Amino acid sequence: MSEQERTEGVAGSTRRQWLAQMGGLAAGAGLSALGGTAARPAWAQGQPKRGGVLKVATVDKPVNMDPGYAQLYSSLQVYQNVYNKLVYVDDKGQFVPGLARSWKADGDKAWVFDLVDNAVFHNGEAFTAKDVAFTFNRLLDAKNKLPMRVFFSPVEGVEALGAHQVRFSLSRPFGPLFAMLAQATEIVNEKALAEKDPKLFPVGTGPYRFVEWVKDDHITLERWDKYFRPGKPYLDRIIFQAPADDTVRLTGLQTGRYNWIQTVPPQRIPELERQTREMKSSPGRPYFPFYLMLNASRPPFNDKRLRQAIAWTIDRSEIVKLVYYDTHVVTAEPTPEPSPWATGVNAHKGGPNLEKAKQLLADAGKASGLTLTYLVKSQVPVLVKTGEILREQLKKVGITLDVRPLESGQYFEELVGKKFDIAGGYWSVTVDPDMFYYPMQHSSSAWNFCGFKSEEADKRLDAFRFTASPAARKKMYPELVRWFQEEGSLVVFSNELQRYWMKPNVQGSTPLSSLELRFEDTWLA
C-alpha cells in the first residue's frame, strides 16, 4: 500500500475541526458540549448487539492500574476502560463529553464544568464533584509525587461548587488544558483508594469493572451494569493478554484465541489485507512517534556533541524500510502530517552525514569510538530490530552498540533509574505537542527519562505551554522543534500509522487521536 493510500483518509478529516476546537477552547471561548456520547465510527456496520467476550491481545503487559502513577501505555490501555475522564477526543478529533456534560470559561484563568448526575463508581459510591476535586488535588499535591502532575502544572486547584459542578482555577492561561483533560487523567474515588491498592485494584465509573489480574497472564473486565450511559457498554467481558510478539498475536487471531489484536507483523500487512473472510483492520488513523532516548544525565551523552553525532549517523529511511515495512512515516518530529502541528522541520536534513558525525566524535575526544548500550522492551520486537539496525549504522563511525532486550518491568526500572546509554521508545500522548515535549524534556518532569536538564529548555517549554492563543503557539512551535532536535537527547525517527486487527464480526473499534483503547462502543455482530 502506498504512502498516499495510507494517509489520504486521515489528512483532510480533522485539520479544520481540530483548529476550530483549539481556537474555541484554548483561547477561552465558552463552550457547551452537546449530547452525551460521540457517534459510532462510520465504518461500524449494523445495529449494536449486547453480549459476548472481546479477547484482546496488546503489545505489552500492564504494571500499574493507578491513573495517577501509571507511566506505561500498556497500563493505560486497560484501565481507560475502567475509569472515565471529564472529556474525550472522538474519532473526528472533537472534544466530547465524558463525566462533564458541559463547560464554559470563567474569565481567562478559570473553567467551570457541569457534571453528569447519574454515574456510579464500581464500589457503589455515587460520583460527585468531590471526586473530581479529590482526583486533581491529589494529583497537584507535590508531596504525592504523581508523574501525571507535570501535565497540569498551571492548575492551581479544583473546587466543588455544588454536587455536580467544579471549577478549575489556573495560575495563567493554559493552551493545552482540554487536550490534557482528554488524555491524561481519569477520575478516582477517595474511598476506593483507601480500601484497596489502586495500583492493583482499579475502581472507576467506566463502562467495565475490574474483575481479576493474573500476573503475566491476563486481566479480566466485565460490563458495569450501572454505567451512566443508557445501553452501554455492549460487551459482557473483555480479557486482556499481552503475547510475546506480533507473530503470536496474529496466530492467536487466526486460530480464534483472540478476536482483537493491537498489531501484526508489518511485513505481512499487504497479504493480510486480502484475507477479508478471516480478519479486518480498522482505518489507519493517528500517528505516534518512535524515538531514541539518549541519557544526558551521565557520560557520554552529557556532551551535546556526542548526542549530535548519533543524530547525524542514524539513517531513518533505512530503519523504516527494514523494520517497519513502510507502515511508519520517516520523520524527525513527533507530529508530522496530517497533524495540524506538522512543521516539516529537520535539523539533520540531508543526513546521515557520517563525516560530520566522525568530526563531532573527534571534537568530543572520542575519535577512537564508543561502546554503548541500547535498552529496549523485549515485548516490542520492532524496537529490538531497530536496535539491531542501529548497531550496524553506528559501526560506520566506530561506535559499538550492545542491544539489551528486557522484560517490561525490568526495562522500566532501568529506564527510570537511567541505567542506559540509548533506549528505544514510543509515545502515545500527542493530541497537543506540549504533551510530548513538556513531560519528556522539562527538568521538573518525572517522565524526563533522558535526564536532560536545561534552563533554556524549561523557558521555551513554559512559553509554549502558557500561551493561550492557538495562533501564537503555532508560530513558536517550529523553532521549538528545531531547538530540541539540535539539543539531541530525543531523536525521533518515525511515526506509526495506528490500526487495529480483528475478526470480521467485531464492530465499533477504531483508533483515536488519544490512542486509548476504549471499548465502550465495541460490539460483536
What does each model-identified segment do?
Residues 90-94, 174, 179-233, 237, ...:
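Gly/Pro-rich hinge or "lid" segments in bacterial periplasmic/extracellular proteins
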Residues 226-271, 283, 391-392, 400-402:
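Ligand-site clamp/hinge motif
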Residues 502-525:
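Long beta-strand-rich cores associated with HINT superfamily self-processing modules
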Residues 329-363, 380-383:
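Structural transition elements
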Residues 57-107, 137, 203-205:
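N-terminal lobe/hinge region of extracytoplasmic solute-binding protein
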Residues 400-411, 416, 438-504, 525:
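Extracytoplasmic/peripheral linker and loop segments enriched in polar/acidic and small residues
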Residues 1-20, 26-32, 40:
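N-terminal secretory signal peptides
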Residues 104, 114, 148-191, 212:
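Surface-exposed binding/hinge segments that line
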